[in-house]
């Protein structure tokens, strides 16, 4: 059987080598079991949409901190099974950093439960056998995740225009190494940036940050970012209102997702991404090499109408790149 919940994945997970297989749809297991404010965790069945859980938490002043692009469609079981990551990962981490406990069913019907405790010191951490297994080892039926205070009124936005990706990677590294943790730390190349920033940065790379949380922490994070970027006089700061507007329109709702499907069928043009991560010492070389090789070696390069990329998940020892393609089908 192939587990499925929100059906938001794009990697062909329902395709199997077996001609006739069963799809186990868990979307009907859609109860929020508990929101535990004292212990700062929430428990939900696998079919609870992330957006439903998030809205329930925000009504109480809390958040999961998890906000992948698939948020309008994705459900909790699939988010854990695919080892998902969200747009605020630089502060909150990825799903593997958020999961406290789990319930799952093995192939023989055995129900296994991993308790909700802050840490384990004995043996391997079984959570990490389940997280990311994509249904190969078990069916995830229940998830408990950490929750955090939700204080959007404290959000601070910073945006910069720069000439090249190398400078942007250097700035991201300095911010991470100095210990600052903005919830958003994004670097767009000129091509990918044309989808968002032509009104103020056409033809330039763009660096974006959002600091959030306790106002003192947000203020210190923002000041630290500004101080680091000031070491690079070639970077030009833009009005924070432009970045706030971008942020408020970053995620799509179900209506816009449905409209895009219609547009793809009508035009035959669609987009896709490939993500890689790399250490600070090699990420710029990876970026330049991939872009160059696709343009010069890919036999269908002429069908690509846009090729670019952005970094949006940074770590102490490196960052990621999403390579973004628009192409004619």
Q: What name fits each language-model region?
A:
Residues 5-7, 69, 187-190:
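Short, ordered loop/turn segments at secondary-structure junctions
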Residues 1-29:
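Glycine-rich N-terminal segment of FAD-binding domains in flavoprotein oxidoreductases
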Residues 30-186:
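FAD-binding subdomain of flavoenzyme oxidoreductases
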Residues 10-11, 23-25, 137-141, 218-221:
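Short, acidic (Asp/Glu-rich) active-site segment that either coordinates a divalent metal cofactor
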Residues 1-2, 23, 43, 65, ...:
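Structural detector of well-ordered beta-strand residues that form the stable sheet scaffold
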Residues 22, 100-104, 128-132, 138-147, ...:
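Short beta-strand elements
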Residues 162, 169-329:
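C-terminal substrate-recognition/cap domain of FAD-linked oxidoreductases
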């Amino acid at each position: 059987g192939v587990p499925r919940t929100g059906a938001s994945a794009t990697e062909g997970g329902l395709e199997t080598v077996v001609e006739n297989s069963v799809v186990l749809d868990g979307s009907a297991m859609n109860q929020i079991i508990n929101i535990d404010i004292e212990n700062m965790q929430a428990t939900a069945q696998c079919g609870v949409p992330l957006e439903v859980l998030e809205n329930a938490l925000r009504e109480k002043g809390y958040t999961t901190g998890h906000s992948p692009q698939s948020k309008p469609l994705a459900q909790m079981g699939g988010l854990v099974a695919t080892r998902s990551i969200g747009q605020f990962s630089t502060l909150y981490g990825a799903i593997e950093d958020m999961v406290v406990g789990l319930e799952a069913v093995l192939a023989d019907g055995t129900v296994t439960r991993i308790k909700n405790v802050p840490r384990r010191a004995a043996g391997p951490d079984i959570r990490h056998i389940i997280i990311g297994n994509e249904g190969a080892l078990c069916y995830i039926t229940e998830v408990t995740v950490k929750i955090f205070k939700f204080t959007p009124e404290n959000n601070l936005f910073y945006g910069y225009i720069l000439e090249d990706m190398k400078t942007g990677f250097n700035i991201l590294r300095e911010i991470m190494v100095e210990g600052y943790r903005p919830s958003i730390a994004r670097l767009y190349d000129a091509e990918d940036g044309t989808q968002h920033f032509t009104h103020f940065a056409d033809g330039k790379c763009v660096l974006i940050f959002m600091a959030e949380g306790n106002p003192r922490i947000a203020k210190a994070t923002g000041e630290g970012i500004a101080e680091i970027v000031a070491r690079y006089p070639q970077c030009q700061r833009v009005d924070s209102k432009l970045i706030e507007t971008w942020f408020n329109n970053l995620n799509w709702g179900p209506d816009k997702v449905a409209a895009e499907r219609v547009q793809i069928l009508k035009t035959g043009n669609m987009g896709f991404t490939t993500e890689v991560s790399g250490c600070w010492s090699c990420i710029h070389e990876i970026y330049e090499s991939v872009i160059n090789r696709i343009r010069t070696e890919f036999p269908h390069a002429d069908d690509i109408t846009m090729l670019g990329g952005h970094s949006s998940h940074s770590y102490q020892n490196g960052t990621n790149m999403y390579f973004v393609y628009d192409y004619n089908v």
